[in-house]
From Swiss-Prot:
Transmembrane segments: none
Region feature (Disordered): 319-422
Protein family: Belongs to the UPF0329 family.
Skewed-composition ranges (Acidic residues): 384-396
Skewed-composition ranges (Basic residues): 357-366, 410-422
Entry protein name: UPF0329 protein ECU10_1810
Cross-referenced Pfam families: DUF1609, DUF3654
Biased composition annotated in UniProt, kind: Basic and acidic residues: 319-340, 347-356, 374-383
Length: 616
C-alpha cells in the first residue's frame, strides 16, 4: 500500500467523516505545512486520484506497546505484576478499552466518497454484542502460580473473542453494499457509475469474505505474527532502541494532531500491514528472525511488504547470521588463545617463584624492606587513582564547546569521561549562512536536488537544517540518552550511519513532531564526520515526496570528499554577529530557542530534542 494511501486511512480516524472533498482539503493542508510550499494543480490531482481509487481493507494491526507521557508502561512481554504500582490504574484503563480498539482494528474500512455507513455499521454491531463473561482487565490480572499473562496474550485473547462478531458484520456489510449498488444515482456519468459500482462490489465481496473461516484465521494470524515480531524486536536491544524511537515519535505525533476519543487515555499504536502478504511470508520461511526483521523494516522505513522488501530482509538476515557465526568462531579462537597464554603465564610465574625461593636461601634481605617497598608502591597507586578521578570531573560545558581544562587539573592527561568527538562537514556548515549565500553555493554545487531553489524555499529549508547547536548535545556525555545509532552501511567506499532522536519544532504557535537526523561517515583518519543534520517532521515522511525514512539504509548524498578539506570540530562555534540562539537544558529535554536578532525578546522558532522514552 502506498504511503499516500496509509495517510488517507489515517485521516479517516482523525476526521470521523469520509466526505472526499474534506479529506482532500485536510491532506492538502498537512502536506503544505509539512513541506512549506503550496501544492500545484497537478499535485492536487494526484492526491484526488489516489483517494478516489484506494479502498482500505484488512490492513490494520495493533502494536502491543503503550506509552504514558514519556514512559513506556507496557511492552509486549509485560505482565500485570511487572507494572509499576503508580502506573497500574492507568494501564488497567487502557486494557479495559481493548475490545473496542481491537474491533476498530479488525473492521476499519475506508470507502472513497462516503464511509459514514460503514462506521455506523461497525459501531452498531459492537454496541449490540454482549461481552458478559469477558473482562480483559481480570484476565490480565489473573496469575497461575507465579506467572501471569503477557500483554500480547491478552491482546490475542481479545482478538479471538471479537472475531465472533465478524459473521454478523460481514453479512450486513455485504447486504448494504449490494443495496447501494442498486441505488447508484442515474445522474452520474457512465465512468462515475463504473467507479462507484466497482468500489461497492469490492466491499460486498470483502464483507462476504469476512464470514469465511479462512479470512477470520488470516486476521488472527496476522495479529499473532505482529505480536511475536514485536516480542522478537523487544528481546534484541539493538533493534528495540530504534523501534522505540519510531514508536515514541508516532505516539507524540498522534497526540498533536488527534483528539483522543478516550479522554486522558492514550490508546496503543496501530500500523497498516497487508495481512495476506505478512501471513504468506511467514508460511514460506517459518522463521521469526526473517519475519521479525521484515516487520521492523516495514515499521521503521514505511515500506510495503513485497518481493523486494522480503528478499532484502532474507539476504540481510542471512548475512547477519553468517557474520554472527564468524564472530562466534573468532571469539572461541580468542578464548582458546587467551587460555593458553594464561596457562603459560601461570607456568612462568611458578618457575619464577621457585627461582626466588632458591635465591633467598643463598642471600637474606634486610628485615622489613619488602614491606616498606610494597607500602610505597601502594601509596603511589592510590595517588595516581586520585589524580585520574580529578581528571574525570571536567565539566560538560567545557567539553561541549571544546574549552580548556581548569588550572587545578593536570594538563598531561586526557579525561576519560570526555564527550564524543565529531567533525562537521562543509555541507552542514553551509546552512549557518544567509539564504542568498546558501542559494549561490547550492546552485554551483554538485547536488542536483538543491539547484535552482527559490530564496523562499531556501529560507524554509534553513529553518530545519540550521540546527548546528545540536552538536553541543551530540558531543556531550548525555548524547546516548537522546539518540540511537542505526545500522552501518557502505557507500562510495565510506562507512556511513545515522543517529536519530525525537524532536518537536515550534513556530508561530504550531508544533511539529518529528526526528532529528544526524548523518555520519568515517573519514580516512578514522574520525566521525557529520555530513547531514536536520529536523524532519513526521508529516514530511508521511507525505513521501522525496522523503526518506530516518532509519532507512542508504542516502542520496554523494561527493563527500568535496568538503572533506574544510571540516570543523565546532570548537567555540558562534553564529555571525547579530544572530541569537539560546540553549536551554532540562532533565529530559535539550531546547534551542531562536530569537529575532533585531529584537531578542521575540522568539522566532524553537527545536526541542527529547530524551528517549523511559522504559519501566
Amino acid at each position: 500500500m502506498s504511503i499516500w494511501s496509509l495517510w488517507v486511512l489515517d485521516l479517516v480516524g482523525i476526521l470521523c467523516t469520509s466526505r472526499i472533498e474534506k479529506i482532500i482539503e485536510e491532506v492538502k493542508k498537512r502536506y503544505e505545512k509539512a513541506l512549506s510550499h503550496e501544492l500545484s494543480g497537478a499535485e492536487l490531482e494526484i492526491i484526488r486520484e489516489t483517494i478516489e481509487e484506494v479502498v482500505g481493507l484488512d490492513t490494520k494491526v495493533l502494536i502491543p506497546f503503550v506509552f504514558h507521557g514519556r514512559r513506556l508502561v507496557i511492552s509486549p512481554v509485560t505482565r500485570h505484576q511487572d507494572i509499576e504500582q503508580g502506573e497500574r490504574e492507568y494501564v488497567e484503563k487502557v486494557v479495559k478499552m481493548l475490545p473496542i480498539l481491537v474491533w476498530n482494528s479488525i473492521t476499519c474500512i475506508y470507502v472513497p466518497g462516503d464511509s459514514d455507513w460503514t462506521i455506523d455499521l461497525m459501531n452498531e454491531i459492537f454496541k449490540t454484542t454482549s461481552f458478559e463473561g469477558f473482562d480483559p482487565v481480570t484476565l490480565y490480572k489473573r496469575t497461575r502460580g507465579k506467572c501471569g499473562m503477557r500483554f500480547t496474550d491478552v491482546v490475542m485473547r481479545t482478538f479471538r473473542h471479537n472475531i465472533g462478531m465478524l459473521n454478523r458484520f460481514g453479512q450486513r456489510l455485504a447486504q448494504e453494499a449490494g443495496a447501494k449498488i442498486q441505488e447508484i444515482s442515474s445522474s452520474l456519468s457512465d465512468e462515475e457509475k463504473r467507479k462507484e459500482e466497482k468500489m461497492l462490489q469490492i466491499i460486498k465481496e470483502y464483507g462476504e469474505s469476512l464470514c469465511t473461516k479462512e479470512k477470520q484465521e488470516e486476521i488472527i494470524k496476522a495479529q499473532e505474527i505482529v505480536c511475536d515480531a514485536c516480542t522478537y524486536i523487544w528481546r534484541r536491544p539493538e533493534d528495540r532502541a530504534s523501534f522505540l524511537i519510531e514508536a515514541y515519535s508516532r505516539y507524540l505525533h498522534s497526540k498533536t494532531v488527534e483528539v483522543s476519543k478516550h479522554g486522558d487515555i492514550d490508546e496503543p499504536l496501530f500500523d497498516y500491514v497487508d495481512h495476506c502478504s505478512l501471513v504468506s511470508t511467514y508460511e514460506k520461511y517459518k522463521s521469526m528472525d526473517i519475519v521479525g526483521e521484515l516487520f521492523l523494516r516495514v515499521f521503521l522505513e514505511g515500506k510495503d511488504i513485497n518481493d523486494e522488501s522480503v528478499n532484502d530482509t532474507v539476504c540481510g538476515v542471512r548475512e547477519r547470521e553468517e557474520a554472527e557465526k564468524m564472530r562466534g568462531e573468532e571469539e572461541r579462537r580468542k578464548k582458546e588463545e587467551e587460555s593458553l597464554r594464561n596457562a603459560l603465564e601461570l607456568l612462568r610465574m611458578e618457575e619464577k617463584e621457585k627461582s626466588k625461593g632458591k635465591g633467598k636461601k643463598k642471600k637474606g634481605g634486610k628485615k622489613g624492606s619488602g614491606e616498606v617497598t610494597a607500602k610505597m608502591e601502594e601509596e603511589k597507586k592510590d595517588s595516581e587513582e586520585v589524580e585520574e578521578s580529578a581528571e574525570a570531573e571536567v565539566s560538560l560545558e567545557e567539553m561541549a564547546v571544546g574549552g580548556a581544562r581548569s588550572k587545578e587539573r593536570s594538563s598531561k592527561k586526557k579525561s576519560r569521561s570526555k564527550g564524543h568527538r565529531y567533525k562537521v562537514h562543509k555541507r552542514v556548515l553551509r546552512w549557518t549562512k544567509s539564504a542568498e549565500r546558501i542559494k549561490a553555493e547550492l546552485d554551483e554545487g554538485s547536488e542536483e536536488k538543491w539547484r535552482n531553489k527559490s530564496i523562499e524555499e531556501i529560507e524554509e529549508q534553513k529553518k530545519v537544517h540550521d540546527i548546528i547547536e545540536v552538536c553541543v548535545l551530540l558531543r556531550s556525555l548525555d548524547a546516548n540518552r537522546f539518540f540511537v545509532s542505526t545500522n552501518r552501511y557502505m557507500k562510495d567506499g565510506t562507512e556511513r550511519w545515522k543517529m536519530v532522536g525525537v524532536g518537536i519544532f515550534e513556530e508561530g504557535g504550531e508544533k511539529k513532531v518529528g526526528k532529528v537526523e544526524v548523518g555520519l561517515y568515517r573519514d580516512k583518519g578514522e574520525g566521525s564526520v557529520i555530513y547531514h543534520l536536520m529536523f524532519k517532521a513526521m508529516d514530511t515522511e508521511k507525505a513521501g515526496k522525496g522523503a526518506r525514512s530516518s532509519f532507512g539504509k542508504g542516502d542520496d548524498v554523494e561527493g563527500l570528499e568535496e568538503g572533506a578539506g574544510e571540516l570543523s570540530d565546532m570548537s567555540g562555534f558562534e553564529y555571525p554577529k547579530g544572530v541569537r540562539s539560546e540553549i536551554v537544558k532540562g532533565g529530559d529535554a535539550f531546547k534551542i530557542v531562536y530569537r529575532n536578532p533585531k529584537d531578542t525578546s521575540e522568539v522566532l522558532r524553537s527545536l526541542t530534542v527529547l530524551q528517549k522514552a523511559e522504559v519501566l
